Amino acid sequence: MQNSVSIVIPSYNLGTFLRETIASIEAVRTPSLREVIIVDDGSTDPTTLEVLKDLEKSQYLVMRQPNRGVGAARNAGIRVAQGEFILPVDSDNRIRRTYLAEGPTLLHRDQSVGVVYGDAEYFGERTGRWRVPQFDLVRLVDANFLDTCALFRKRVWEDVGGYDEHMPHLGWEDWDFWLRAAVRGWRFVHLQEVTFDYRVRAGSMLTEVNRHNAVMDSYMFSKKELVALGEMRAELHRLLMVEQTMEYRLGRGLLKPIRAMMTMVGGGRTRAKEHPVRSRSTTPTVQK
């Protein structure tokens, strides 16, 4: 399991936070960590450029490309990664030891497992624990509950063809990636402990993603491999509307047994309070 993990960090103008991210990696470094790859996605901020130069001098692999978006930046880093397992980390977050200490063991133990993910701790403009549910495809089809910071086999990335670099809007790459991995039969395993720290800050895409729901739903679920999931999602939403209408007409108490049955069958719907966005990126929209 030594030298099995490649950490890939897309970076755009967040040099101050990037130092903190790197420090968190060094603080939990284990023999499983093979390399740290930083992909500069066309940064223009002088501080960030200076930080990147310093990291390069410290023997980190720094790749540079014109601003093409977070999906392209991740793909560029993963493409050259030598590790069997990939851990994408946003350049304003911090990781904990669990991913490097326990993740590779789980993946080595069971070849059918493609993705290992865990809970997160919010910091910055929000605090508290983000408790991620056990994996359930119906729940994932309804709404994303997995951040990009999850350990997965490089073979998963190869199998799905990488992150979509042509999203009409940024911030949805993770959900699309996880769905395409799931429909190909890869198993997801949940570590029930905090595996990384998730920064909530002004100016991130945390509050922007949901504005593009309709456009992105149409784009993602028109993909050939996701059409069936799109039909499932539409039916789930239709049933939800029926449930809400019946609750209005009959009262919530009468429908408690029905809601309990739906929860048992589908794993329950993802609530906004669990995690308010589908995913988020620290890379700006690319100007075409």
For every predicted segment, state its role:
Residues A23-L33:
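Short, acidic, metal-binding catalytic loop of nucleotide-sugar glycosyltransferases
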Residues I86:
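Short aromatic/hydrophobic "clamp" motif used to bind/position activated sugar donors
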Residues Q65-A81:
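Glycine-rich, basic loop-to-helix element that forms the pyrophosphate-binding segment
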Residues D40-L49, D90:
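A conserved acidic beta->alpha catalytic loop
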Residues T98-W130:
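Conserved donor NDP-sugar-binding/catalytic core segment of glycosyltransferases
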Residues H169-F177:
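Acidic donor-binding loop at a coil-to-helix junction in glycosyltransferase catalytic cores
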Residues L33-G42, M63-P66:
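Short beta-strand/loop segment that forms part of the nucleotide-sugar
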Residues R211-K288:
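Boundary detector for helix-to-coil junctions that initiate low-complexity/charged tails
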